Amino acid sequence: MYGETTLNKNHVIKFIKLKINNCLGCDEVEINFSKADNVHIIIYSLVTDMAKDLPAVTPVAQAILLLCSLTYPDSDSLETIPQLKIGKGSVSMSFKVYPVNKEEETEPESESDLDEGPSTSKQALERMVQRAERKAKEASTRNVHSKGIYVNVERRFDMYFALDTVSYYINGGKRQSCPLPEFHAKFFVRPQHSINLLRQLHEKCSGNWLKVIQSDGDGDAFKKFKDPDSPFETFVKLFESNPIKPNDMMGKLAKTCLHVNEAVRLTEREFILEVFNQVRHIFEYITAQEYTVWFLVPCLGDKDQLRSKTLEDFDLTKVRTSIRRAGDTSNIWWDHTDHNIKDILLVAFQLDLATHVNQSVLVISHLETLAEFSTMQYVTAFFMNDFYAKKNTEPKWICHRYLERIIDVALFLGVIVIIEYPSAFTLLQEGRHLIKCFQKENADSSRTSQWEIFEDVVKENESDLEFLKEAVGKVQQNV
């Protein structure tokens, strides 16, 4: 069952435990993941700023990427992690894989189908045997689907010859070793779009998300577009040889190839429009319908204005992204949009693309601007309501729980999402499990940084600002 079989399709993965041993700025850290759902929140604070092109900031998220993604597949990529020193340490994780392919589950059969019509003693005995075998098969299937399989995986950094290798065992069985890509192909699905590529969108693509969707996530987003006027056209030389005599079979083959190519091209266009539409829905939900996003797709030059438009009539190479406030008809182009709203649109694209490619693990990071905006909005609402809206009948200042809404979308889409959030003001519901990572001043100059990591939960008064209000009151009295 576990040989060459790929287990990542039609399965759900549940993280159980993560261990970081003498690496990534940690001595020994053990984290137990929440059993409630697959969205894990990491609250962190930094002493020194991290590079914006790092896929993850905290040791916890970096360890997850080291084990559950192909972000760092070899020694060269490992050297890009500033907190990782090659030559010591390891990271390990345990997770559970649940099969969810309903089509392969054995449905309970009616017992009456074996009892129709008269039967001899021999036939009755045969039916009893069949019924027992059927029930045993159903019980076995239910047992597998309820238990799933446990996987323990470790990646070590103290063996220079095996930096691209992981060791793992399934259900406590024999330990096996294999290259990281092989392990990843067995349990996880590779993300098709680089977060760094998305972040460079407004610099390279001027708001044209089409180029991001069509890019493979490696390098320049424009490299696939040799003809900017028709990015979906792929011209293939079917025959590159001397002229050949007409042949009915060759003609039919060429015609079939053209039909298939046309169907693929139209499917690509439908996919892009579907992504745009779903991103709009996600974006509107996270912003509480205060904003919407329009993807303005111009039509190709067509003199026949009366003819109904089809997918062929749109120029998908010149898509413009316009973010609008609810009820506003003016265009706010991507480059002129508030940075906090840009962050939300970026998150919306990540969530949607992760579901389209059946991505198992998604890390959302670098939400500093969104966190700052949410914190200031909350502080403003707190003080304005306290000083100017004391009566229940008076209008109230509000603040939006953007992070809570991002979690709602992630839960709905069913992807394992790791969210790194650089603020204690999460405004999350009481009781949600948190992983807190606080960077500390260097006690030893030989270490790049030290981290304090522990588990916590959202408390009822976690976002209480009474202490700040008292401090402001004392300052005003002194003045």
UniProtKB/Swiss-Prot annotation:
Biased composition (Basic and acidic residues): 124-140
Keyword set includes Nucleus: yes
GO CC, alphabetical: chromatin; condensed chromosome, centromeric region; female germ cell nucleus; male germ cell nucleus; nuclear envelope; nucleus
Extent of Acidic residues compositional bias: 104-116
Main localisation: nucleus
Subcellular location: Nucleus; Chromosome; Chromosome, Centromere
Keywords, comma-separated and alphabetical: Centromere, Chromosome, Meiosis, Nucleus
Subunit structure comment from the entry: Interacts with Sce.
Record's function text: Essential for proper maintenance of sister-chromatid cohesion in both male and female meiosis. Mutations in ord cause premature separation of the sister chromatids in meiosis I and random segregation in both meiotic divisions. Required for chiasma maintenance in female meiosis. Mutations in ord reduce recombination in female meiosis.
Name of the molecule in the record: Protein ORD
Species assigned in the record: Drosophila melanogaster
Lineage, broadest ranks: Eukaryota, Metazoa, Ecdysozoa, Arthropoda, Hexapoda
